[in-house]
């Protein structure tokens, strides 16, 4: 009976030790995987910076701002004209309409 209890205890301890070793091995794999991920992300960033030349980015930004200016200039002018008309009507003393007859 003691022999059976010792064998069961030995099997339990060995399985727990094996689980602990597997857990520790999994942690190092996660660390390795994370470091490889960061390295690939860094390499991708470097490649992207090499491909996208600063002059290209500046040209794209200039084109965007020119396009925005072309679209917004008429709108701003029209809004300014409407605002001035509104203010001039508000400030000019016009005759009030006669009250409606009862």
Swiss-Prot record:
It is found in: Secreted. GO terms for molecular function: apolipoprotein receptor binding; cholesterol binding; cholesterol transfer activity; enzyme binding; heat shock protein binding; high-density lipoprotein particle binding; high-density lipoprotein particle receptor binding; lipase inhibitor activity. The modification Methionine sulfoxide is found at residue 49. The keyword Signal applies. Monomer. Interacts with NAXE and NDRG1. PANTHER family: APOLIPOPROTEIN A-II (PTHR11027:SF0). Residues 1-18 form the signal peptide. This is Apolipoprotein A-II. GO terms for cellular component: chylomicron; extracellular space; high-density lipoprotein particle; spherical high-density lipoprotein particle; very-low-density lipoprotein particle. Pfam families: ApoA-II. Keywords: Cleavage on pair of basic residues, HDL, Lipid transport, Oxidation, Secreted, Signal, Transport. One of its GO terms (biological process) is positive regulation of phagocytosis. May stabilize HDL (high density lipoprotein) structure by its association with lipids, and affect the HDL metabolism. Gene3D superfamilies: 6.10.250.100. The keyword Secreted applies. Plasma. Belongs to the apolipoprotein A2 family.
